[in-house]
Amino acid sequence: MAKETYVRTKPHVNIGTIGHVDHGKTTLTAAISKVLAEKQGVDATDFAEIDNAPEEKERGITINTSHIEYETEKRHYAHIDAPGHADYVKNMITGAAQMDGAILVVAATDGPMPQTREHILLARQVGVDYLVVFLNKTDLVDDEELVELVEMEVRELLSEYDFPGDDIPVLKGSALKALEGDPEQVKVIEELMDTVDSYIPEPARETDKPFLMPVEDVFTITGRGTVASGRVDRGVLTTGTEIEIVGLKDEVQKTTVTGIEMFRKTLEEAQAGDNIGALLRGVDRSNIERGQVLAKPGSIKTHKKFKAEVYVLTKEEGGRHTPFFTNYRPQFYFHTTDVTGVVELPAGVEMVMPGDQVTFEIELISPVAIEQGLKFTVREGGHTVGAGTVTDIED
């Protein structure tokens, strides 16, 4: 069967549901899908399909996630829901699903629970800056004051992690009742999605950001010069533009792109997502290597020392069998290459066990083009043992 073409008529936004286990994330996801589908007369994705999340591999890590899509009048959404807590942690840290915003689900019957806090912290660390709150299961709480108390607790918790707790929109309802078709609760879901439409801003398009391309390969074309190939990470590149070659060396080289090719055809302009070869003026083959990046001048710098939020794989996931300690020296895989680094654990953390999620400091042996929010994997002897996100640059 021929694949449907994706017609781009509305702005596209990636969102997800986060929150404690059994607070109703998947039920809410199914309810949103159903309510919006009925409004538009299309098929909904049902609970069982979402709950039975397929395994995906991202950076060598297996994650169960469900991606569903739906539309409001204003936007097209891709919605991600992960069944298990470990799946969420892995998802957010590896960037398997880059979320522009999220719906935080809190059961009014329980209030904020440990994973509620953990997901809020993760959202803060990996750059999910916009949250909308859905207080679920309010039909099971007789006392209105209790619901208000839970709302206050959630707002305080959000403020604690530098979210605007007082201003974040909070909606109250029952995802299950909405899924069963209760008209009053269907209205709440419609209201929730109107709020998501207006509160979670449209993401800056990748093409509007400064040009960046990690170098995957370098070769020479006789008589023409050196070509660096790779996938454009963000921004656009036009022939004749001045760029910088950044990373792995202390000094930055400037050069001009004299030609761009894609699939052996000449291209005037390359955009985010394109796999290209860029012909670089006056650059010797020995002066550029895999793992460096081509970038808009001044847009990215090299660093050696940074803090990161890291998920350490379990033995079952192919990770280490034993804990590691301060001064652990694995390889950190950034962009397209491994660089050795030394781990310094925070005060009070003696060791890190497989399966842990932890923040620590890393000092690399060579400078790499990095910035806040960059994803990387931790490797040892060619095997992935962890995945991380840069949270703070220290040098």
Curated annotation (Swiss-Prot):
Q: Which organism is it from?
A: Leuconostoc mesenteroides subsp. mesenteroides (strain ATCC 8293 / DSM 20343 / BCRC 11652 / CCM 1803 / JCM 6124 / NCDO 523 / NBRC 100496 / NCIMB 8023 / NCTC 12954 / NRRL B-1118 / 37Y)
- Where does the UniProt entry say this protein principally localizes? cytoplasm
User: Quick one: which gene encodes this?
Assistant: tuf
User: Where is Mg(2+) bound in this sequence?
Assistant: 26
EC number in record: 3.6.5.3
The segments labelled G3 in the record are: 81-84
Kindly give the InterPro entries that the UniProt entry links to this protein: EF-Tu_GTP-bd, EF-Tu_GTPase, EFTu-like_2, EFTU_2, G_TR_CS, P-loop_NTPase, Small_GTP-bd, T_Tr_GTP-bd_dom
Q: Map out region (G4) in residue numbers.
A: 136-139
> What Gene3D superfamilies does this protein's entry cite?
P-loop containing nucleotide triphosphate hydrolases, Translation factors
Pfam families under this entry? GTP_EFTU, GTP_EFTU_D2, GTP_EFTU_D3
User: Which protein, by its recorded name, is this?
Assistant: Elongation factor Tu
User: Per the similarity annotation, which family is this?
Assistant: Belongs to the TRAFAC class translation factor GTPase superfamily. Classic translation factor GTPase family. EF-Tu/EF-1A subfamily.
Function recorded in the entry: GTP hydrolase that promotes the GTP-dependent binding of aminoacyl-tRNA to the A-site of ribosomes during protein biosynthesis.
| GO terms for cellular component | cytosol
Q: Which spans are transmembrane here?
A: none
Write out the ranges of the annotated region (G2): 60-64
What NCBIfam families does UniProt report for this protein, alphabetically? Answer: EF-Tu, PRK00049.1, PRK12735.1, PRK12736.1, small_GTP
Give the quaternary structure.
Answer: Monomer.
According to the entry, every stretch annotated as the tr-type G domain falls at: 10-204
Q: Sorted alphabetically, which HAMAP family does this protein's record hold?
A: EF_Tu_B
Query: Region G1: start and end of each range?
Result: 19-26
Per the record, the domain of life is Bacteria
Q: Where is this region: G5?
A: 174-176
| Catalytic activity line of the entry | GTP + H2O = GDP + phosphate + H(+)
Q: Which residues bind GTP?
A: 19-26, 81-85, 136-139
**What general EC class does the enzyme of this chain belong to?**
hydrolase
Q: Which UniProt keywords apply?
A: Cytoplasm, Elongation factor, GTP-binding, Hydrolase, Magnesium, Metal-binding, Nucleotide-binding, Protein biosynthesis
Where does it live in the cell? Cytoplasm
